[in-house]
């Protein structure tokens, strides 16, 4: 069953945006019921013919969000890899995504950053709809590595992936809010790791094999997110 996030409710109807209406037209929804997600809750609805409204049939109970908040701080990657990581992170259950620049980031974003952010937000939206999320994870404009560490220092669990780390993954059994930092293709240098460790980050290895950044993000998210 198709699902769409909506922001406006009038009495027993949701107001659908032109973007949502175009999607509904593309998938040829006419008489079939579908689901609207409004303020993190699910509603079974039907389209009102020749209008921009969906009539509410009933509210559906359900919470598909993880027990803990997990933030993915991901270094800027090549466009295809970065967008793939966003998509899969949302499907797995990430709460927020913080893009960042570090020393070895080779991919420099050019052009209109706000336009790129809009595209990332659309990926988050479509992935959240596809995976039946109650909310759309937030993704931010890129920040530098130093600012990232400062913003992340108060998380109860702070992990940074580093191929030369001696520690294996040790995730607490009880769900806790967590931030994980995944570096660029060139990894982190020793100074960057030391900066993170001074603020309480645990540097961890993901195993004997070197993973691509997008693969490392998926692997670590599946370990940290608690359903």
From Swiss-Prot:
Cellular component, GO annotation: cytoplasm
InterPro entries: Alpha/beta_knot_MTases (IPR029028), RsmE (IPR006700), RsmE_MTase_dom (IPR046886), tRNA_m1G_MTases_N (IPR029026)
Intracellular or extracellular location(s): Cytoplasm
EC top class named in words: transferase
An individual GO BP term: rRNA base methylation
GO molecular function terms listed in the Swiss-Prot or TrEMBL record: rRNA (uridine-N3-)-methyltransferase activity
Keywords: Cytoplasm, Methyltransferase, rRNA processing, S-adenosyl-L-methionine, Transferase
Family, as annotated: Belongs to the RNA methyltransferase RsmE family.
Function (record text): Specifically methylates the N3 position of the uracil ring of uridine 1498 (m3U1498) in 16S rRNA. Acts on the fully assembled 30S ribosomal subunit.
Name assigned to this protein: Ribosomal RNA small subunit methyltransferase E
Organism, as annotated: Mesomycoplasma hyopneumoniae (strain 232) (Mycoplasma hyopneumoniae)
Annotated gene: rsmE
